[in-house]
Amino acid sequence: MLTPKRVKHRKQHRGKMAGNAKGGTTVAFGEYGLQAMEPSWVTNRQIEAARIAMTRYIKRGGKVWIKIFPDKPVTQKPLEVRMGSGKGSPEKWVAVVKPGKIMFELAGVPEEVAREAMRLAMHKLPIKCKFVKREEVGGDAHEG
């Protein structure tokens, strides 16, 4: 499971999920990517389940990059505890995902295999996603 090794503060505010992703919106490492279409918290267990689903399908072929990391602690109070008496203890770690963020990347497999692997990963995640391909930036810009 993905968790931070050490953190400056054990507990965090929930924060807002307004707006689109600032960075990480293009396919950088692989050939294909899985892009978020809506904002959500994605837990470390969901990330791991999606990774396993993809790697099982591609069967040792290709490489998978995980572009999100669960660095936000989410606290929870125990069951049947009265209100008040402080904030609960950290229960799980989540990654804040905003629309446009590339969450996973894949390379070294044919497009139809990548598409199916990403489709299996989408079912493990709590948000709508879309399959994207790497956009080659014009290579003839410096010639002339």
From Swiss-Prot:
Region (Disordered): 1-22
Record GO cellular component, one term: cytosolic large ribosomal subunit
Biased composition (Basic residues): 1-16
The keyword rRNA-binding is assigned to this record: yes
Database matches in Pfam families: Ribosomal_L16
Keywords in alphabetical order: Ribonucleoprotein, Ribosomal protein, RNA-binding, rRNA-binding, tRNA-binding
GO aspect biological process, one term: translation
Domain of life per record: Bacteria
Complexes and interactors: Part of the 50S ribosomal subunit.
Family: Belongs to the universal ribosomal protein uL16 family.
Function: Binds 23S rRNA and is also seen to make contacts with the A and possibly P site tRNAs.
Protein's name in the database: Large ribosomal subunit protein uL16
Organism phylogeny: Bacteria, Bacillati, Bacillota, Bacilli, Bacillales
